């Protein structure tokens, strides 16, 4: 099986129909990623098969169990090289996607990817979640907030949850320590207005990686004091 077939089968395993145009977009995305990675640090993974599995399929796995659907508004917080937001957008082309990152160089990269791939309804925010989570144009405006960052779960919650509408979802892609992080997040869940829904185990082809998706529903408005000022959530997480 070649790499594009591996990607195709993986996407279809998440109950998403593929076509040649979609698969070509993923191929080009990876090429742009590798090219830009020469001048800035976007990823430690460049090999085609590894990018397809560990970045693209891992990102797309966020659709499992139906919390993300076409037509929804999504904000990807701390998106970095565009994960999971851009792979989700390629697969579900009527998503309204907002990509937020604190580094302008990464925003420039994301704008270039979106331009080349002709992705519509993508908004770019250069800034910190702590600042934009207070902005009434963005606060509690999204059906879903996603994160695939390395920060601890209570920190990610404070970054992401203020963006989510009541009734919407916070979906966090995590590694093997998801259960431990969940235990450490009970106070943040209560304070920020969340209800824990489920942990979804993700199996990716040809890699021995234990990935999990944590799903939370927003059941009440987030208190106005959150998010706290830039730097505070990381220095003093809600615990």
Where are these regions (language model features)?
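SAM/dcSAM-binding transferase cores
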Residues: 183-239
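Residue-level signal for inorganic ion chemistry
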Residues: 33, 88, 174, 216
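Class I SAM-dependent transferase core
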Residues: 2-71, 75, 108-122
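Conserved SAM/SAH cofactor-binding pocket of Class I
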Residues: 60-151, 157
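Conserved beta-strand signature within the Rossmann-like core of class I S-adenosyl-L-methionine
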Residues: 167-177
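Short alpha-helix immediately C-terminal to the canonical SAM-binding loop
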Residues: 106-108, 178, 182
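Helix-to-beta-strand junctions that scaffold the AdoMet/dcAdoMet cofactor pocket
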Residues: 92, 164-166
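Short "lid" loop at the C-terminus of a central beta-strand within the Rossmann-like core
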Residues: 130, 152, 175-179, 204
